[in-house]
């Protein structure tokens, strides 16, 4: 098949091109002419020592950012960005708001960080403490004495920044570390204690410029649900709860988390993922009939709770608080372990695709 051209139109265009621009006539403006010029220096902290610096909300707005050769600094990026690289930094405290792509630490030592990103990687780093939210499996390479905890932070603009970065607050693999260069007989990474307090590692900003950001490190206010991760579970009883897509899915999940944690259960892990009918058949088995139409509306949100009486407690809260909402909850202690394994094995495969 060919393309059609108009000779008449071509002659007209040629005649228009041949006509000189009239005096005083404004030249044509194109979208790329109007695009605001970006100065890389506005998106970089380099060579700083003994300083507190940062970027306020809306001052990075999805651009790439670079931090390099800083020593004994407090650095706060209170905005979403595309990617961030941190090179050759020593004894720094760093907060990084949601990063759409990767965060890469290289040749850093004795740093304490709070980071939210899609991909996290370190190379040639030593003695770092990281409170992390990461959508994919974090990777360390040629790095030692690395410690990880779950992201816990709040300021009013943070939830919207997660959305602008395309990150789900419910997909966090902070504790599932892959050591790209393991050494036999040595452990290059570990998990921070569950009661670790962020402010003991990274102070809240105290400069006049940054104090206007209403920051809280209170675990109960955290945008990201604080999970137990891959630490040894306190009990051999877990329960799987799955909310299906709707107008209040995330809000319902947060309410469920608050209820169960308030009852003394541990939130082990969360996941937001799309499911096909064949996936649901493998995960939910005999309970699929009423779920088919719900799967077509969007991703599901799964929560694993752990503790004595977890199944009974979850069923009670679901019946009393979410009676008008379709929710999957494990039927018994015996089936719950299978439910958790089936769902998260499926979810891990989906996230790895």
UniProtKB/Swiss-Prot annotation:
GTP binds at residues 101-102, 118-121. Residues 1-37 are annotated as: Disordered. Keywords: Cell membrane, GTP-binding, GTPase activation, Lipoprotein, Membrane, Myristate, Nucleotide-binding, Palmitate. It is found in: Cell membrane. It holds the Pfam family TBCC. It is a lipid-anchor. GO terms for molecular function: GTP binding; GTPase activator activity. InterPro entries: C-CAP_CF_C-like, CAP/MinC_C, CAP_C_sf, CARP_motif, NDK-like_dom_sf, Tubulin-bd_cofactor_C_dom, XRP2. A lipid is attached at residue 2 (N-myristoyl glycine). Myristoylated on Gly-2; which may be required for membrane targeting. A lipid is attached at residue 3 (S-palmitoyl cysteine). Residues 27-182 form the C-CAP/cofactor C-like domain. Its main location: membrane. Belongs to the TBCC family. Acts as a GTPase-activating protein (GAP) for tubulin in concert with tubulin-specific chaperone C, but does not enhance tubulin heterodimerization. Acts as a GTPase-activating protein. May act as guanine nucleotide dissociation inhibitor towards ADP-ribosylation factor-like proteins. This is Protein XRP2.
């Amino acid at each position: 098949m060919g393309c059609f051209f108009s000779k008449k139109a071509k002659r007209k265009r040629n005649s228009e091109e041949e006509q000189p621009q009239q005096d005083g006539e404004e030249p044509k403006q194109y979208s790329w002419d109007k695009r605001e010029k970006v100065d890389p220096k506005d998106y970089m902290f380099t060579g700083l020592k003994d300083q507190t610096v940062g970027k306020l909300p809306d001052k990075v707005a999805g651009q790439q950012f670079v931090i390099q050769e800083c020593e004994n600094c407090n650095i706060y990026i209170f905005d979403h960005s595309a990617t961030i690289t941190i090179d050759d930094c020593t004894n720094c405290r760093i907060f990084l708001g949601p990063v759409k792509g990767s965060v890469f630490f290289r040749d850093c030592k004795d740093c304490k960080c709070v980071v939210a990103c899609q991909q996290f990687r370190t190379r040639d780093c030593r003695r770092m403490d990281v409170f992390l939210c990461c959508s994919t499996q974090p990777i360390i390479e040629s790095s030692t004495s690395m410690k990880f905890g779950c992201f816990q932070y709040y300021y009013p603009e943070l939830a919207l920044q997660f959305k602008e970065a395309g990150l789900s607050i419910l997909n966090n693999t902070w504790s599932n570390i892959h050591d790209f260069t393991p050494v036999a007989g040595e452990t290059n990474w570990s998990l921070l204690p569950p009661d670790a307090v962020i402010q003991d590692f990274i102070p809240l900003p105290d400069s006049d410029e940054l104090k206007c950001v209403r920051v809280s490190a209170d675990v109960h206010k955290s945008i990201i649900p604080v999970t137990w991760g891959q630490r040894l579970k306190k009990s051999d009883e877990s329960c799987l709860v799955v909310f299906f897509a709707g107008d209040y899915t995330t809000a319902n999940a947060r309410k469920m988390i608050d209820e169960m944690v308030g009852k003394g259960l541990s939130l082990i892990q969360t996941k937001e993922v799309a499911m096909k009918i064949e996936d649901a058949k493998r995960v939910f088995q005999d309970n699929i009939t009423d779920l088919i139409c719900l799967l077509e509306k969007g991703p599901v949100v799964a929560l694993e709770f752990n503790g004595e009486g977890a199944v009974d407690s979850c069923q009670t809260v679901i019946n009393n608080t979410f009676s008008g909402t379709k929710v999957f909850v494990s039927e018994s202690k015996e089936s719950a372990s299978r439910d958790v394994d089936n769902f998260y094995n499926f979810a891990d495969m989906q996230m790895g695709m």
